Regions:
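Conserved alpha/beta-hydrolase
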Residues: 1-22
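Short beta-to-alpha linker loops that shape the active-site pocket of alpha/beta-hydrolase fold enzymes
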Residues: 13-17, 87, 208
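Catalytic nucleophile-loop/oxyanion-hole region of alpha/beta-hydrolase
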Residues: 18-52, 219-224
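Alpha/beta-hydrolase-fold enzymes
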Residues: 54-145
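Active-site nucleophile elbow and catalytic-triad environment of alpha/beta-hydrolase enzymes
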Residues: 138, 142-164
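Short beta-strand/loop motif that positions the catalytic acidic residue
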Residues: 169, 175-177, 181
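Short alpha-helix in the alpha/beta-hydrolase fold that links the catalytic acid
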Residues: 171, 185-195
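Catalytic active-site module of serine/aspartate enzymes centered on a nucleophile-bearing elbow/loop
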Residues: 199-201, 206-235
Length: 235
């Protein structure tokens, strides 16, 4: 849909995912992940030097994009940001004992994998997400350091006391979340939208699940992607 609207798309496999090397789920340390985003942006700038660039992130990627908007090295060079279903507040709450356990584990064994099992039906339209079960790159793992950093950054962004530098927060952002998300609670996005209401266009999708772009029983998610396309075209 983006390409049909003459919008070029560049993507990267995050550390610990896809075809990258390393322990599966070890998308850490965060400062290096943000540097990876720098490289993606610079690559896009090199390919299209006179074209505006927008950074798009979903779920944990949404957490990373919000983080980048706050303190990324090139955050002020971007025209805008699109974030969907970000990891700010999890549906499954992390208790104090669990938090301190992960904190200790992250220090002692940062690459220790924590496995999770997510029902595909909780993600989006079943005929779209069922294929994940046979995807060789799906691993359902996150490491202790990645979990801790993502959790702490999400918490700081929720309370709006996360580190800020550059002009990223002055750039427009489209933030979207489904009110039936069973992975990342919609309350997190509502709080981000309130914290950043001057530059944030917040859209809450009724009866939509975690992967907005993959729809639900009534829709295939096309309208969500089209909303993102219209935002990018408006920049």
């Amino acid at each position: 849909i983006f390409n049909r609207n003459k919008i070029a798309v560049f993507a990267l496999d995050l550390r610990g995912h896809g075809k990258t090397d390393g322990v599966r789920g070890h998308t850490a340390p965060r400062n290096m992940v943000l540097e990876d985003v720098d490289k993606l942006i610079l690559y896009a700038m090199e390919k299209y030097p006179d074209i505006k660039i927008c950074l798009y992130g979903h779920s944990m990627g949404g957490n990373i994009v919000l983080d980048y908007r706050n303190r990324g090295n090139l955050n002020g060079e971007l025209a805008g940001y699109v974030v969907t279903s970000p990891w700010i507040t999890l549906q499954k709450k992390v208790g104090k004992l669990q938090y301190w356990g992960i904190k200790l584990l992250a220090k002692a064994m940062p690459k220790h994998q924590i496995k999770s099992k997510i029902d595909p039906a909780a993600l989006g339209r079943i005929d779209k997400v069922k294929k994940y079960e046979n995807d060789q790159y799906m691993h359902g793992a996150i490491t202790a350091q990645c979990a801790l950093e993502s959790f702490e950054i999400a918490r700081d962004m929720y309370y709006d006391n996360h580190e800020k530098k550059g002009a990223g927060r002055d750039k427009p952002m489209l933030l979207m979340h489904g009110d039936k998300d069973e992975i990342c609670h919609v309350a997190g996005s509502r709080k981000i939208a309130k914290n950043q209401e001057d530059t944030c266009d917040y859209v809450e999708w009724k009866n939509m699940l975690h992967e907005l772009h993959n729809g639900n029983e009534e829709s295939d998610g096309t309208q969500v992607v089209e909303q993102a396309v219209e935002f990018v075209k408006s920049l």
